[in-house]
């Protein structure tokens, strides 16, 4: 079956329910061959691709399928095993590989899986390369197959996680430790379940672990960055200094202060931007945030003399705007933070280390660091939908948006958008009064659910 261009790739690689198109073994083999074909178009000869994955049960079959496609075209593959997405980006550069592949659906439930592709420089491939891969999959024209003696070899890399652990620790100031800090750590039963505890423990922190027992079917299930309530309770129970919640593939970070209050990506971005400016390490005094960033946070950054470039939601868009504006720091409310001085993609562990460093150097608690940031009341509700109908075509939805805008006036805003990776419509309302914001968001949600809402299935 032929596919239209852009039918495979979404906003963050290929993603979908395991064993349903496009996330099938058959399509994964074709993707492996197409990735190889694109590499061989650049130049003939030897090529090397690293392949990592998170802890989903379906990761095994997609790992084998992709490697089969790659090696059938003469590509050498290096299996990294379970490793965070930023670890794949790092190892791709460290091993001078021609590409890196991460098998993960990030924060999605275990039933989903996905494929993210990195170029040799550790950045995610661009749209032009994605479209070339799609075209090859559709035509099944991957170029000449190698002779039987020239098929690729597959090797397992035993020290990949160890190298990533050392890299992450090296982003923390030499000679400093986390001694005296008690940390509650939630790894979402995901790709960081081995490396994150090791990083913080080897820096002498006392670590209390949650979400570190993956079964293949429990990744992101009531834990991790999407469910910080787990560590909110644990921080209070264990009298910890801080809580750290990562998502399934380790590129997101949400923290909890010593009082049990959630510190989201907006707040963490503000803390890190302020620190970089103080140290005169913030290029052009600029950070990149997104359309979802809280207005109170934007006002705080501007009060510090920090310029804010606004991008669409998604770490790919954040990175693009960072590169265009030569910014070294960017992030979004969901917890993606990119420190270009350290890595080419979001890295939850490295981001956490930077916040912990700031706490130690300033002799402050996390609540001290957030005390001066006054967030605007905001409601964000995810609505499961049956399909992503253009929102502008839904008369009732447009009608309620108009009504809510009239109520808010100039003192608030509404953002209604589909998720790029799930069948979800995100409803965000921001204003000056919490009860009003919550009520107006619920009003919009009710109409969206009536028009295109879906039953939640497990």
Curated annotation (Swiss-Prot):
Matches recorded under InterPro entries: A-D-PHexomutase_a/b/a-I, A-D-PHexomutase_a/b/a-I/II/III, A-D-PHexomutase_a/b/a-II, A-D-PHexomutase_a/b/a-III, A-D-PHexomutase_C, A-D-PHexomutase_C_sf, A-D-PHexomutase_CS, Alpha-D-phosphohexomutase_SF
Phosphoserine PTM positions: 106
Domain of life: Bacteria
Keywords: Isomerase, Magnesium, Metal-binding, Phosphoprotein
GO cellular component, one term: cytosol
Maturation and modification: Activated by phosphorylation.
EC id: 5.4.2.10
Note describing how the cofactor binds: Binds 1 Mg(2+) ion per subunit.
Required co-factors: Mg(2+)
PROSITE patterns per the UniProt record, alphabetical: PGM_PMM
Catalytic class of the enzyme: isomerase
Catalytic residues (positions): 106 (phosphoserine intermediate)
Residues involved in Mg(2+) binding: 106, 247, 249, 251
Family per similarity comment: Belongs to the phosphohexose mutase family.
NCBIfam families: glmM, PRK10887.1
Role this protein plays: Catalyzes the conversion of glucosamine-6-phosphate to glucosamine-1-phosphate.
Stated name of the protein: Phosphoglucosamine mutase
């Amino acid at each position: 079956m032929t596919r239209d261009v852009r039918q495979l790739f979404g906003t963050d690689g290929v993603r979908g329910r395991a064993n349903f198109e496009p996330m099938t073994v058959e399509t994964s083999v074709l993707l492996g061959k197409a990735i190889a074909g694109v590499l061989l178009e650049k130049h003939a000869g030897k090529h090397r691709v690293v392949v990592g994955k998170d802890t989903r049960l379906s990761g095994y079959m997609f790992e084998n399928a992709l490697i089969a496609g790659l090696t059938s075209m003469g590509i050498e593959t290096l299996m990294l095993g379970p490793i965070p997405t930023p670890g794949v980006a790092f190892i791709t550069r460290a091993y001078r590989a021609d590409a890196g592949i991460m098998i993960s659906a990030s924060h999605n439930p275990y039933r989903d899986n996905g494929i993210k592709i990195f170029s040799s420089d550790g950045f995610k491939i661009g749209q032009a390369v994605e479209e070339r891969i799609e075209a090859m999959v559709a035509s099944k024209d991957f170029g000449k197959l190698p002779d039987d003696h020239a098929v690729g070899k597959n090797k397992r890399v035993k020290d990949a996680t160890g190298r990533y652990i050392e890299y992450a620790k090296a982003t923390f100031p030499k000679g400093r430790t986390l001694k005296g800090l008690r940390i509650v750590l939630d790894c979402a039963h995901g790709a960081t379940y081995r490396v994150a505890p090791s990083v913080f423990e080897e820096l002498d922190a006392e670590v209390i672990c949650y979400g570190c027992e993956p079964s293949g079917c429990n990744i992101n299930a009531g834990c991790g960055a999407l469910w910080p309530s787990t560590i909110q309770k644990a921080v209070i129970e264990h009298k910890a200094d801080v809580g750290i919640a990562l998502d399934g593939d380790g590129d997101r970070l949400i923290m909890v202060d010593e009082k049990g209050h959630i510190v989201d990506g907006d707040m963490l971005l503000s803390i890190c931007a302020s620190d970089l400016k103080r140290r005169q390490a913030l290029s052009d005094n600029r950070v990149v945030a997104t359309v979802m960033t809280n207005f109170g946070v934007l006002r705080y950054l501007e009060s510090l003399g920090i310029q804010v470039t606004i991008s669409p939601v998604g770490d790919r868009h954040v990175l693009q705007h960072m590169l265009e504006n030569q910014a070294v720091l960017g992030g979004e409310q969901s917890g993606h933070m990119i420190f270009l001085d350290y890595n080419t993609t979001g890295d939850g562990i490295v981001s956490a280390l930077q916040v912990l460093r700031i706490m130690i150097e300033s002799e402050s608690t996390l609540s001290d660091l957030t005390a001066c940031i006054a967030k605007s009341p905001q409601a964000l509700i995810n609505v499961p939908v049956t399909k992503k109908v253009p929102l502008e075509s839904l008369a009732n939805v447009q009608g309620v948006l108009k009504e809510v805008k009239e109520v808010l006036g100039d003192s608030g805003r509404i953002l209604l958008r589909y998720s790029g990776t799930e069948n979800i419509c995100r409803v965000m309302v921001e204003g000056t009064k919490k009860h009003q914001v919550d009520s107006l968001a619920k009003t919009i949600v009710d109409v969206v659910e009536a028009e295109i809402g879906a039953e939640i299935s497990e």
